[in-house]
């Protein structure tokens, strides 16, 4: 009964993800109908925002526009696959706290202990699940525009670095980082 109750309303599509033959996780973030007024009336087109990830540290997003919804989704998925970026993960969570933004959208992501789950809203949740983060605390502030939230989240995740990468940049060993 409790499982049925959870599947009603806005939560029913929350965990909807598609695994395609190549092992990528595809998430549909938003579909929007846009109208253009012309002499003969209104012309409707659709936009789709999607996120694609491998669940192991790669993620990309795409934005497609077309006269029909399935075509817009297909275009955005293709674009997302072309724009994959790598993210350094630490056993299913982040290495450190991340603050970033795009436009007026601001995102804050913090590593969480095992068993916490993905505590994030809408567009951020889709990106974090697609990249393979299992435990994270996240908050979006400012604009909640899905496109800008996805851009800010991907930008923040790709800028995050593991201690090994920081040590390699500085020409040191990981053990030397905290000791000057």
Curated annotation (Swiss-Prot):
Quaternary data: Part of the 30S ribosomal subunit. Contacts proteins S4 and S8.
Record's protein name: Small ribosomal subunit protein uS5
GO cellular component entries: small ribosomal subunit
SUPFAM superfamilies: dsRNA-binding domain-like (SSF54768), Ribosomal protein S5 domain 2-like (SSF54211)
InterPro entries named among the record's database cross-references: Ribosomal_Su5_D2-typ_SF (IPR020568), Ribosomal_uS5 (IPR000851), Ribosomal_uS5_bac-type (IPR005712), Ribosomal_uS5_C (IPR005324), Ribosomal_uS5_N (IPR013810), Ribosomal_uS5_N_CS (IPR018192), Ribsml_uS5_D2-typ_fold_subgr (IPR014721)
Species assigned in the record: Stenotrophomonas maltophilia (strain R551-3)
HAMAP family: Ribosomal_uS5_B
MF terms in GO: rRNA binding; structural constituent of ribosome
């Amino acid at each position: 009964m409790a499982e049925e109750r959870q599947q009603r309303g806005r939560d029913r599509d929350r965990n909807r993800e598609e695994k395609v033959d190549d092992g990528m996780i595809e998430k549909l973030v938003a579909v929007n109908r846009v109208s253009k007024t012309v002499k003969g009336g209104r012309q409707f087109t659709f936009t789709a925002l999607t996120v694609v990830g491998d669940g192991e540290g790669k993620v990309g997003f795409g934005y497609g526009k077309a006269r029909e919804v399935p075509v817009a989704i297909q275009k955005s998925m293709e674009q997302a696959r072309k724009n994959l970026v790598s993210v350094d993960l630490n056993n299913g969570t982040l290495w450190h706290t991340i603050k970033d933004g795009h436009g007026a959208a601001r995102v804050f992501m913090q590593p969480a202990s095992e068993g916490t789950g993905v505590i994030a809203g809408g567009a951020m949740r889709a990106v974090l699940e697609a990249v393979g983060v299992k435990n994270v605390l996240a908050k979006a502030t400012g604009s909640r525009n899905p496109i800008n939230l996805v851009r800010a989240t991907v930008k923040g995740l790709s800028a995050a670095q593991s201690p090994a990468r920081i040590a390699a940049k500085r020409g040191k060993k990981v053990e030397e980082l905290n000791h000057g």
